[in-house]
Curated annotation (Swiss-Prot):
Compositionally biased residues, Basic residues: 31-40
Lineage, opening ranks: Bacteria, Pseudomonadati, Pseudomonadota, Gammaproteobacteria, Enterobacterales
Disulphide bonds in the chain: none
Similarity comment text for this entry: Belongs to the YihI family.
Segments of skewed composition (Acidic residues): 147-160
Name under which the protein is recorded: Der GTPase-activating protein YihI
Gene Ontology terms: biological process: ribosome biogenesis
Purpose: A GTPase-activating protein (GAP) that modifies Der/EngA GTPase function. May play a role in ribosome biogenesis.
NCBIfam families according to UniProt: PRK05244.1-1
Amino acid sequence: MKKPTSAPRSKAFGKQRRKTREELNQEARDRKRLKKHRGHAPGSRAAGGNSASGGGNQNQQKDPRIGSKTPVPLGVTEKVTQQHKPKSEKPMLSPQAELDLLETDERLDALLERLEAGETLSAEDQAWVDAKLDRIDELMQKLGLSYDDDDEDDEEDEKQEDMMRLLRGGN
């Protein structure tokens, strides 16, 4: 039993007839007519461009033809040049006032307490503390003060009081 080599063909798949020039022209006109309607709707640029996507939002949109509401000067005016202001330098404090400010500085006190507690400070904080302590030393030297002056004054006062007690009656 041999199978047939080719399947039986119907007449639909047979030779197709050639189209006439008139039919070809008509198909081309139809294709061209379809291509004409591919672009944006007429007037879409003036209408805002988003008419297809935001259908219910059109009442809230601004009209793009309306410009800025800022007033425009109509006459010739001279351009006002602003004078460059030099940065105001910090007012120089007296050494005593600056020393008082440094002694009452909360950040410095907090960092010194942390140092006394044995904590290690960051490099930035340590540099800041060192700079402030150096400034305090400079101011104290300018004012003629030292750390030991207070102790020596107290000791001298105590010695004088002791001498006065001895001279008065030994109480």
